[in-house]
Swiss-Prot record:
Transmembrane segments: none annotated. The gene is phomP1. This is Peptidase S41 family protein phomP1. The keyword Coiled coil does not apply. GO terms for molecular function: serine-type peptidase activity. It comes from Diaporthe leptostromiformis.
């Protein structure tokens, strides 16, 4: 085990005795806990036009609980995978849960696939990624497409076994996520795609058999990686590993998952090139490499600049540099004769929304930002809102941007202040909202309060207007994606589309039909389970303080009301999680540890668009203006996608818009 990269034979001998036969006495309580956290999820029923199947999470949790009781589930690992698959069926990137046995080993293999159209207009086929590279070199005769995996039609296997677990609301985005991502290297994420990683899950077989159209076969053998963060691999049986990974109260000096570092050892295979190694040198970039400006080499496209933004996961001082780099890039492009702009957001999974708003304002400094959100009006949120709104008043309220449960903080979708006179005015429920019990509409937050010189939204709060006039008109801007645009990325694209900016997207399922540019979550706000725990803890402290206050002592009616709220909070709230990852175990209030790395979350607020203020934006289908299949050149040289996109979006029909698979409005 010293290499920490365990070959398949060892995986079978060791893991079948350790992971797959974990002790299993506590998982029913874990399912009950998950159901309490599940009540925070904001979205309701999807309309018939929604492309992905819907799932009743609470009913699913109840079915899992029954399987535990009747003995159908036999191990902790089986339970954790079943719960993970249920959560993933919501196709909501903001809804995630980190389960203890799934965070021990990461399974993967070294044979990534890719979906390629040989000429760009014919339907793409599946190829081993290395074969696509050979195809690009011209050796087409030696290459054969993949037609089967483990005896099943290959596309069916990939979409039904793996893609359904990936959390994107759009099936084309899920399909693209199966394959290598050239932008993954900028953010340090796995570059080979979900087919090669199986989301870290045991694939169910020690050998995966690929059959090619020419009749040949290839056996793929998964391996397991032991993360260095788990500490030394010195466990001799399943009981010992279970106690370390899943039970609080470890006697170790370090809590499982708290060791520094990433993964020990290197894969026994080469990952597809990604990040800076596969893109040309940028003209301008930030120190984190998340913002990069390029010019196109094609002589016919010298008036086109490309601004590539691979993530919005930044904060603090990095936010200021992020903003300054975008401003510098736009200024440079404008001053060097660039009249057209491609904004490449491929693989951008979102992050901090403030830099996203700032980007929009630098492109459209004369346009105010409108944001509309709602939360589900539940009993528990009502208790929290009453606690926070009663405590934070006047100037104090302005200091509290999160939680957005103090009515004094809330502003209208158009940033009007003082529109909610009480918590009831915000909580609702809105009588005009049909079908679900939802709050009244309000903005993400007050931009005037949130925007600072360190974390600016151009022209709001203390941040000056970074760019005073438009440098590019809407018809001269196009957004490029691979469908894997989510959260803050989705918000940015939505704001740009409202101004008339067009979108072009690459890849997707092998069908000649439209594809969405934004295939990831389009929720209004993600709350981690630790955030929820922090708000519950604070609300409990505030109510206890109010209960013993002088005012309550003098007013028995008020004291009784506060006591009732405190009791209701204790009845409805889920058990507390540690407020930071890997906190001391005495913070835990239930018997199983989960969320070791602090990634579990729910979608707290829905987002809405002006054209439809009663259907969550998550459920609204929005086709890209142009869709393109990936050619071998696009796979090997991802920067070539910019040439294709620019010719399609800016060149007119004579320059190549016929290459759009589904022509909508170019």
């Amino acid at each position: 085990m010293s290499s920490f990269l365990v070959q398949t034979a060892v995986v079978r001998l060791f893991l079948l005795g350790v992971v797959f036969w974990f002790p299993f006495a506590l998982s029913s309580s874990c399912a009950e806990i998950a159901s309490k956290f599940g009540t925070w999820k904001s979205e309701g029923d999807a309309p018939p036009s929604y492309l992905s199947p819907t799932v009743d999470l609470l009913d699913g949790l109840d079915r899992i609980r029954k399987k535990i009781i009747n003995g159908t589930i036999s191990s902790q690992y089986d339970f954790d995978n079943l719960l993970h698959r249920l959560i993933s069926q919501a196709n909501d990137g903001h809804l995630q849960i980190g389960l203890c046995s799934r965070e021990i080993f990461r399974f993967q293999h070294g044979t990534p696939l890719t979906s390629v159209s040989r000429e760009g207009l014919d339907l793409p086929q599946l190829y081993v990624h290395s074969d696509a590279v050979i195809m690009h070199s011209g050796q087409v005769e030696a290459i054969s497409p993949v037609v089967e995996i483990n005896g099943l039609e290959a596309d069916y296997y990939l979409q039904s076994r793996i893609a359904v677990t990936l959390g994107y609301q759009d099936p084309d985005a899920r399909y693209n996520a199966l394959f290598p991502s050239p932008s993954a290297g900028f953010t340090g994420t796995y570059s080979a795609g979900a087919w090669a990683s199986n989301s870290g899950e045991w694939p169910g077989s020690a050998v995966l058999t690929i059959r090619f159209a020419n009749g040949t076969r290839l056996e793929v053998k998964p391996t397991a990686t032991w993360p260095a963060t788990n500490g030394p691999m010195n466990y001799t049986d399943g009981q010992a590993l279970f106690e370390a990974a899943c039970l609080p109260g470890t006697s170790s000096k370090y809590i499982f998952g708290s060791f520094p570092g990433m993964y020990l050892g290197l894969p026994a295979y080469e990952l597809p090139r990604s990040g800076p190694s596969v893109f040309p040198a940028p003209t301008i970039k930030d120190s984190n490499g998340l913002v990069r400006l390029y010019s196109l080499e094609d002589a016919a496209l010298q008036d086109v600049a490309v601004l590539q933004i691979t993530s919005f996961r930044i904060g603090g001082e990095d936010s200021r540099e992020f903003s300054a780099t975008i401003r510098q890039s736009l200024d440079w492009a404008s001053s060097h004769g660039k009249t057209k702009l491609l904004l490449d957001l491929s693989g951008n999974e979102g992050g901090n929304v403030i830099p996203g708003f700032d980007l929009f304002r630098m492109l459209f400094p004369d346009e105010p930002i409108r944001s509309e959100t709602r939360f589900r009006s539940t009993e528990l949120l009502d208790v929290l809102g009453q606690a926070f709104s009663a405590e934070y008043r006047g100037a104090d309220a302005k200091e509290i941007l999160d939680p957005p449960l103090a009515a004094q903080n809330a502003v209208s979708p158009d940033q009007e202040e003082n529109v909610f006179g009480s918590w009831k005015d915000l909580f609702g429920p809105d009588p005009n909202y049909e079908g679900d019990s939802m709050s009244n509409a309000y903005a993400v937050f007050s931009f005037a309060a949130a925007s600072t010189t360190f974390e600016p939204i151009s022209g709001y709060g203390s941040a000056p207007l970074a760019i005073k006039t438009r440098l590019f008109e809407p018809q001269s801007i196009a957004v490029v994606t691979d469908g894997r645009c989510a959260s803050t990325c989705a918000i940015v694209v939505g704001l740009l589309q409202a101004q008339g900016v067009r979108t072009v997207t690459f890849g997707g399922r092998p069908r000649k039909a439209p594809m969405q540019a934004v295939g990831g979550v389009k929720g209004g706000q993600r709350w981690s389970l630790r955030t929820i725990s922090r708000h519950i803890k604070t609300a409990r402290e505030l109510l206890a303080k109010q209960y013993t206050s002088t005012a309550a002592q003098a007013n028995s009616t008020r004291r009784l009301a506060v006591g009732h709220l405190l009791q209701k909070l204790n009845d409805l709230a889920p058990p507390a999680l540690p407020l930071i990852p890997r906190m001391e175990d005495n913070e835990w209030e239930f018997a199983l540890r989960f969320d070791t790395y602090g990634q579990s979350s729910v979608n707290f607020r829905d987002a809405y668009v002006p054209a439809n203020e009663t259907t969550p934006w998550q459920f609204i289908y929005e086709a890209a203006d142009c869709r393109m299949f990936l050619t071998p050149e696009n796979v090997v040289d991802p920067a070539s996608r910019w040439n294709s996109a620019a010719r399609a979006m800016f060149g007119g029909r004579e320059m190549g818009s016929e290459k759009c698979v589904d022509y909508v409005s170019v």
